[in-house]
Amino acid sequence: MGESFRIRPLDPERDRPLLGRLWEAALGSVWPLPPGALDLVKEGLVAERGAGGRHRGSGPGDADRADREVGVVAVDPAGSIPLLVVDPAYQRRGVGTRLLEAGMARLGQFGATTVALGSGGSDYIWPGVPDNLPGAVEFFRARGWGFDHTVIDLVADLRGYEAPAGVGERAGRAGVSIEVMAGPERAEVMAFEAATFPDWVGWFERLDSSVLVARDRAGAVAGTLLFRGPLGATIYEPLLGPDAGTIGCVGVAAPARGAGVGSAMVARASELLRDAGTRACHIGWTRRERFYTRLGYAPWRRYHMARRMAPG
C-alpha cells in the first residue's frame, strides 16, 4: 500500500509560509514567487503526509507539521481552482489527484456548478494553466480535463514608447474622442459595462484602476479600458521588473467596431502609462495576439483554458 495522506482545510494566514515554500520548490525556477499571488489564496485544502494525529495550532509541533505538509489546492467559491501545487518530492504519488478531487468536492459544496482552472472566480493568479508548466497541463489532461482554447499575455517596454503612425486617425475621422474618465461619468460608464461587457463589471467596480473612455460623435460611450501603473499594478512585478503597469478589459461597443477605436484606446493608455513612469506594461488574458502586436506588444506567456461541471 502507498503512503497515506490526510486532507485538512487551508488557513490562509497560518499556511502562508507553506504556500511560499511549496511554490518555490515546485514552480520557482519558472515562475518566481509573486508575493501578491499568495494574497489571492483565501480558501483551499492542504495535504498532510501520514494519517495519524489531529491537526495542531501554532506551537512546538510547527516544524514537524511543516515536514508533513506536502501539497495545497486553492479554490475560489465562485467556481475556480486558482492553484494546485505539490512538493516535488511527493509528486506522482497521488497527492495532486487527491487534492484535485477534494477541491472539486469543496466547490460543489460551495454551490459552484462549473469549475475552471486558473480563472473563473473573483480573482486569479493565472487565466488558465501556464503553457510553460507542461507537466501541469498533462496532469489535468490525464484526469479528464479538456483544454478548449489558449489565451495569451503580452508585454511592452513603454520607455520611449511611440504609438504606431496613424493609429488614431480612423477613430478621429469617425468623430471619436478618448479621455480619462472623470468622476461624474462613472455611473454612465458602469451602465455601459453592465449592458455591453457584463463579465467585466466586477473589475470596474474595484476602483483600483483608471478608466479610459471613448465617446462617439454624439457623446455616447463607445468603448472603455482599464489601465494602472506604475505602482502596485500587477502581481507579476517580480518577473516584469519594477514600475510595471497593466492594461485590461479593452472593449468597444458593436456599432463602433472596425473604426480603430480599440487600437486608439490601447495606444493612448500606453502613452499615459509611459508618461507616468511605467516601464513594462502587461496585457493579460486575450486571444487577440495580432491586434496587440500591431500596437507594439509582444507575446509573453500562454495559458490553456479548461472548464468542467462541478460534482453534484
Residues of each region from the PLM?
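Acyl-donor-binding surface of acyltransferase catalytic domains
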Residues: E101-A174, A306-R308
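Short amphipathic alpha-helix that is part of the acyltransferase structural core
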Residues: M1-P35, V46, R68-E69, V151, ...
